[in-house]
Amino acid sequence: MNKEEDLSMFFIDTSRHGQAVYDPIVNQSLDNYLINDLALEGHGLIMYINAPCVIIGKNQNAYAEVDLDYLEKNDITLVRRTGGGGAVYQDYGNIVFENIVVGDTSHYGDFSYYAQPIIDALTALGIEGVQLKGRNDIVVDDLKISGMSMVKVENALAAGGTLLYDLDTQQAGRVLTPNQDKLKTKGVKSVDKRVSNLKPLLKGDLADLSTEAFKEALLKKIFHTEDLDSIQRYTLTDEDWAIIDQRVADFYGKDEWNYGSNPGFHYYKTAYYPGVGTVAFNFNISDGVITDFKTYGDMSFGQPDQVDQAMIGKTYDQDGIAAGLKAGNYQDNIGKLAIEDLVSLILN
């Protein structure tokens, strides 16, 4: 495929010398390279499988979301994505899909637009009741099979998510349950139990497909073909991989990015808001004044650190907290929430 071709949708082959790449840190860094460097004009799609890992959103507190001791003991990699969203466990029974769009970003924020090809493909494979529910979840009869996130950089965006095919759901529940003894306060969100794998829902010849074989079947439905060799594609070159490898070494593979810091401030308040997701505040108070403040959550947009800076020095009362939230442009940087709800969360 020529880089200058203007295609409505094409496949970006992320295999390396013909071999699938399962390293989650490498795979998670792909969208940044594809958007900022390669920048293929049009609508591209990547699809891959990760080795066991936990992916967290860019604004999440790893120490509050994940049992890090359990990860280390079980050789599970922690990876931070460049977009928002919640914490998810992935393994060889999970498929990741990502739309890489350069040029026309008019559908930014529209999860239904990027979910529809997946919904149509699953329906074509005989799975009934597939639909988008809420802001960014794909469900089958109210059981979650996919969560999506989105990030935009100038004239490009990445919009994608996961598909639970044959995921070890017991492992997922275990790894996303934080070690409460290591937290100074409670209030960590619970793991969503209403999830489902797709494999038990398939019938006939499809019922025993491996994850790789199911991924291939899904791609055939998405591109409306029985021969994937016939679809328009771009295959990553050695030059592409050299840049990706350097980015991983310099940034995406470092603990400073993936783990972040754990402020360990005394107060930790968290709540879930429909349409926005989880919002959490970690802060200290001295003599009735907020001295330290850190915002976490599932938010994909804005700059929560603006709220953090605005809250420091404000009085720990209704008026002071409201003033800090307003000064930090909380609706742009946290979500479209009533200020009374956030003030109540921080105070109570």
Where in this protein do the model-derived segments appear?
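Active-site loop/lid in soluble adenylation, ligation, and acyl-transfer enzymes
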Residues: 2-63, 150, 195-202, 206-215, ...
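A short glycine/serine-rich beta->alpha loop
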Residues: 17-18, 81-87, 103-105
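Short beta-strand
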Residues: 45-48, 88, 129-132
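ATP-binding N-lobe of GHMP and related small-molecule kinases
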Residues: 50, 56, 66-72, 96
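Short helix/loop capping segments that flank catalytic or ligand/cofactor-binding pockets
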Residues: 56-57, 64-66, 167, 172-174
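Active-site cofactor/substrate anionic-group-binding motifs, chiefly glycine-
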Residues: 64-87
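Catalytic beta-strand/loop module used to bind and position nucleotide/cofactor moieties
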Residues: 92-206, 218, 248-300
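Active-site- and interface-proximal helix/loop "cap" or "latch" segments in soluble metabolic
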Residues: 195, 289-348
